[in-house]
Swiss-Prot record:
Cytoplasm is among the record's keywords: yes
Native source organism of the sequence: Streptococcus suis (strain 05ZYH33)
Protein name per UniProt: Exodeoxyribonuclease 7 small subunit
Localization per record: Cytoplasm
Family of the protein in this entry: Belongs to the XseB family.
One GO CC term on file: cytosol
UniProt-listed InterPro entries: Exonuc_VII_S (IPR003761), Exonuc_VII_ssu_sf (IPR037004)
Root EC class: hydrolase
Pfam families membership: Exonuc_VII_S
Quaternary context: Heterooligomer composed of large and small subunits.
Reactions catalysed according to its record: Exonucleolytic cleavage in either 5'- to 3'- or 3'- to 5'-direction to yield nucleoside 5'-phosphates
GO-annotated molecular function: exodeoxyribonuclease VII activity
Transmembrane segments: none
Protein keywords: Cytoplasm, Exonuclease, Hydrolase, Nuclease
């Protein structure tokens, strides 16, 4: 079975849905824990994608052709 890669926007929408669901507070504890774990994984993936995009932008923006890392 192949794992389909979701877009950044799809992952963000899924994370927002999880947050909304948990904020309502009408979820059973077991489901809340599972959703929280899923949200943490999504959050980590989103942060990784943003960091990679930032590195790419820094490389593109260097006028003199040199590459610099952002902190």
């Amino acid at each position: 079975m192949s794992k389909q890669t979701k877009t950044f926007e799809e992952n963000l929408a899924e994370l927002e849905g999880i947050v909304t669901k948990l904020e309502r507070g009408d979820v059973a504890l077991e489901e809340a824990l599972a959703e929280f774990q899923k949200g943490m994984v999504l959050s980590k993936d989103l942060q990784k994608t943003l960091a990679e995009a930032e590195k790419t932008l820094v490389k593109v923006m260097q006028a003199d052709g040199s590459e610099a890392e952002m902190d």
